[in-house]
């Protein structure tokens, strides 16, 4: 079932939104186009922000628990987008992309899809998040069943779609880990563990770049074959010494910098023997990242937090790192940099503050 509904008169599910003030009227003020925000670092540039809030009403603009989801919503042009369950606990259960008025919570449209060729339970719908693009006025979403869509941001009409599991052999496992799209110039890039035929017959974490307006594939690249994990690391777009770069952790445990226009590898660092889920942080050419698995250089130690110079080329070794703290299991949460202090939350919920 693939269904689209526009401007329904009643609500069928939603999430909570805390507002700092009235939603801005200008097209780009207050936009939050991907889950880590406008600077890809988890820091809001808006002021003032509320210092306190409560789900019972303090600084709460509206609340729609029916659309609750593990997915982080995004905002563009006064509209909020997210992924959540459709018809939960029924024989028609699937997933849907919803668009609501960010100021009022009114449902504007929703697009409903089946979840198929996946072992993931329904509770893991929304592991990925919608990504919005002002230039094409589109939103992009990868569903739990690896159904990748480009939707008209105003109406929800499907502009193009790819069933990544059927076309590219993308795997959606019980863990439900699906990756986040990233928009670069005329491209939208998505990745996942894929297995196909010919040279792609062996499973590998692979990246595919599509023309964001037509859905036509532009480039396709593989990482090291037979990875241990599927992952949900979000690619970070940046530039190193004037060269555009996409920094992302792979299912093979390697942190990569790719040329986003071509997919060519700029550099790579073998951090772990298992997949990297932590979204890297890039600031002034320095890459900060972590993981909570076996270290590639010391398999008897779990986890590490590290920094490297993103302006390097080729294979990065342990000796090339700026610093590394083994044994810190920072395997889920992206670090945040404030001044010269790096704030990182480990998998046990301990907060570490590092002098960079």
Segments (PLM) and residue ranges:
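N-terminal secretory signal peptides that target proteins for export/translocation
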Residues: 1-7
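Bacterial N-terminal signal peptides
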Residues: 9-21
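Noncatalytic, solvent-exposed loop/strand surfaces
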Residues: 24-356
